[in-house]
Every structure is written in structure tokens, then in C-alpha cells.
Amino acid sequence: MGKGGNQGEGAAEREVSVPTFSWEEIQKHNLRTDRWLVIDRKVYNITKWSIQHPGGQRVIGHYAGEDATDAFRAFHPDLEFVGKFLKPLLIGELAPEEPSQDHGKNSKITEDFRALRKTAEDMNLFKTNHVFFLLLLAHIIALESIAWFTVFYFGNGWISTLITAFVLATSQAQAGWLQHDYGHLSVYRKPKWNHLVHKFVIGHLKGASANWWNHRHFQHHAKPNIFHKDPDVNMLHVFVLGEWQPIEYGKKKLKYLPYNHQHEYFFLIGPPLLIPMYFQYQIIMTMIVHKNWVDLAWAISYYIRFFITYIPFYGILGALLFLNFIRFLESHWFVWVTQMNHIVMEIDQEAYRDWFSSQLTATCNVEQSFFNDWFSGHLNFQIEHHLFPTMPRHNLHKIAPLVKSLCAKHGIEYQEKPLLRALLDIIRSLKKSGKLWLDAYLHK
């Protein structure tokens, strides 16, 4: 019935009952070939559309058969715009007698968290200070300039080369935190501007891929520390994490490596090799295999700029070695910072928690200081960042006291540590998991 329908026809259309579904029925549709999810009690069939999902089909697929309301709000700053894509996918609603939450999730925590989000919006905590991000970009470009001037003025001796490498590694680490801001759509109101600048920062300043990052990182945020859903805990049999995985490996007599020594070999193959070996290879292969030609062009522009800048000082082979040494230094920085908030927390199979509880279970904070903020790209406020991923990082400290209060109200632990302890806890966690594996391997 179009706009030309008469009043009687419109009334008849409104009287048509909307299909309703129980959670039992919805939860059956959690397969790769059959996906339903719920947002604000409305049921959507995303089976075919998930392939077109800008964030990737896996991240949205992880919520198949579940309520995705809070995840939907967390990832999308412009709800009115993305809501247009949902309308054709609507197939019904939750039955009136059904609770809004699936799997017995805590409705009171969810209600309080949504009230907290409304408070954050009323406090304008999702509003960006653009000068802040311009200064971040300026200091990255300044570091790049200082690095070039050092080798230009002092020559390519060992001391000047080491200084230049450390300055460039610092620039790369800071560019990594900055691309993270744009990737989360936390800078500009319009997603398209965030996407454009994201490609510039991660592509031209770092030589990486925006699509690759989106595909991995959004899954991590959607289901942090959940095996088979969070790619950040897929260690390719190199490490065993948490309590469940090492025991399972031990029971099955899986011994790809001596995991009881993983807290020792972590120093050899974790921080040194993640970026220069694994990520660098994976990023290039992903862009080629998935034909991400725009991302590849941005990445190539980085390598062209780097080699034009440093081949005159080191030659082709020397510049290539220099690049990988910078990646080696940056990798240490990246691994220690990114793992201190997650690897020490609960890592397990899907437990179907509410959004607030799932993020608090998987994340912890590091104490605030000017250095900690800069060193970690404000990921020392990992809890707040995970709860509100589109909130500009300069506002995370403002919402932290309210998050702490909500945790106290519901008896949820809010973990915050000094930086050194957070770093050392990585090793303690690996050692603990290694012991669990050895015990299960020998005795179960």
C-alpha cells in the first residue's frame, strides 16, 4: 500500500499483527547461514546483510541469537543513520512476555548502564576537542621531522641511527594510538570523515590497513577475551591463556610448545616479533587476498615515503633493515601496553553476560598520570574505553568516577593498577596459565 491508499486501507495495515518470537526460537538462529539478533526488542534477520556490514560479518555474527542493543549503541555514533539499514531486515518483535535480555542477563545492571550512558551524553562527553587531536597529529609529524633531521645533520653513524630509530618508533606508537581514535569514530561526528582520516593515519603514517584493523579490533570490542570470537586471544598455539584453555590443552595432551615456560619465551617471541613478523605479513596478505586496493595504495604511500627519505642515508638494504628495527622497537611498546589491560583478566568461552559486566570482566585500568596517558594513548582507561568506544579519549577520565560507582553498586570489581604492576602481571598471568597446563598435561 503506497501513499495513495485510503484511510481504511491504512487502518487495516496497522491492524496486521507483528510477528513475535520467544528467546528460545531466536537463539536457534545463531549459525553462519542463519542469523537473527535483537535490538530494542525488535528482531532482525541479518543472515544475508551481514556480508555487507561495514564492520565485517564476524563482529555482527557474534551477536546472532542474542540481544545486541548495547553493542549497537556502543559502536554507532549516528543511530538514526544506521537505523535505516535495519528497517528492511525487521522480521518481528520479542513476545510481550519475554524479557528484554537473553540468557538470564542482569536486567538491572543493563538498565543502570543505559542510564549512565544517558548521563554521559548529557555531560557532552561524546563531544570532541578537535585541538587535542590536532596536537596529537602535530607531535607525530614533529617526531618524524626530528628523526630525519637527526640523521641528516649528524650522519648515519650508530648513535644517530639509534636515536633516529627510537624517535621513529615513538612516532609509530603514537600514530597507532591516534589511528585507534579515528577507527572508533570518536573524533568527527560524521563517520565518513573518521574513515578518511583513519585511512591516512593507519595507511600513510603507519603502512597498515584500516579494513584489517576494523575486522580484528571490532570483534575484540564486541566479545573481549572470548575464545573463538576475540581474535586477540587467538595465540596460534604459541601461548595458552586464562584458566580454561591451558587445562583443555593439558587434558588433550597438546604440547605445541613447552607452555610451562611461556612466561620466559614470551620475551623472545612476543614483544619482539608481533609487529615486524606476524602483523606486517598478515596485513599485506590480507590487503592482497581481500583486494583492499585503497588500503594497499595508502600503505604503499608509506613505504615510498620511508624509502625515499632513508635510502639516501642507508642504501636499499640498510633502509629495509632500519625499517624492521623500528618495527621491532615499536612492537615491544605495542605488546606491553595492549596486553596489560586484557591478558591478565578472565579469558574464557562465551558466558553471555550483559554489556557492562562483559567489559568489566575482560578489562582493567592503569592509574592516571600525564605519562601514562601519553604512553598508552589513554588506554590506561581501558574499562571506560570498552564501555564507550566512541567517546573521545580526553573525556574518559571524566566518566571513570561514575563507572566506579556503578561497579560498587552491583558488587563488580573495578581493577586499577600502577603501570609497573600492570606490566608485571602479564608475566604472572602467563606463568599461572603455564602451570595449569603442566598440571593438566601430567595428571588429567
From Swiss-Prot:
Lumenal topological domain residue ranges: 153-157, 286-305
Keywords: Electron transport, Endoplasmic reticulum, Fatty acid biosynthesis, Fatty acid metabolism, Lipid biosynthesis, Lipid metabolism, Membrane, Oxidoreductase, Transmembrane, Transmembrane helix, Transport
Sequence motif Histidine box-2, residues: 217-221
EC number: 1.14.19.3
Residue ranges annotated as motif Histidine box-3: 382-386
GO cellular component: endoplasmic reticulum membrane
Top-level lineage group: Eukaryota
Membrane topology: Multi-pass membrane protein
Residue interval(s) of motif Histidine box-1: 180-184
Domain notes: The protein sequence includes a number of characteristic features of microsomal fatty acid desaturases including the three histidine boxes HXXXH, HXXHH, and QXXHH (these domains may contain the active site and/or be involved in metal ion binding), and the N-terminal cytochrome b5 domain containing the heme-binding motif, HPGG, similar to that of other fatty acid desaturases.
Protein name as annotated: Acyl-CoA 6-desaturase
Source organism per UniProt: Pongo abelii
